[in-house]
């Protein structure tokens, strides 16, 4: 499966959704995608939120022709009900080579304070959580 199809899926899945700053949400996965190197990393980067935030499923992605390697990497960066806490989720991403790179890129973009309209206690807590997660992922 190719990058072009992954972009089409992401654009359609995130259509009409805005981020916390009011920008089209699709700009986030596209930014994550552009910060990665290989085609597989870029595919996972642009699709990293489709299962977590939209009607897409891992099965549907596999049916679209994405390889087990790609679907497993997307799974590694998708929060699930089995995650007892955020550290379980981060450790799962860390254990997948593609997932690790994608999650690092995702967190770095999420830490861009220019995307946040106002920084309060909630945002500071989130930024601290992201900083700790980066330490774990980069260790």
Where do the language-model regions lie?
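Active-site helical microenvironments for divalent-metal-assisted chemistry
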Residues: 1-139
């Amino acid at each position: 499966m190719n990058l072009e199809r992954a972009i089409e899926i992401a654009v359609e899945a995130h259509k009409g959704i805005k981020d916390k700053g009011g920008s089209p949400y699709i700009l986030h996965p596209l930014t994550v995608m552009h910060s990665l190197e290989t085609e597989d990393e870029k595919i996972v980067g642009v699709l990293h939120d489709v299962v977590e935030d939209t009607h897409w499923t891992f099965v549907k992605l596999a049916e679209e022709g994405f390889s087990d390697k790609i679907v497993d990497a997307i799974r590694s960066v998708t929060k699930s009900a089995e995650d007892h806490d955020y550290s379980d989720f981060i450790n799962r991403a860390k254990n997948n080579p593609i997932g690790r790179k994608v999650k690092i890129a995702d967190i770095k973009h999420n830490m861009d304070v220019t995307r946040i309209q106002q920084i309060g206690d909630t945002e500071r807590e989130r930024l601290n959580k992201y900083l700790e997660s980066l330490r774990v992922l980069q260790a």
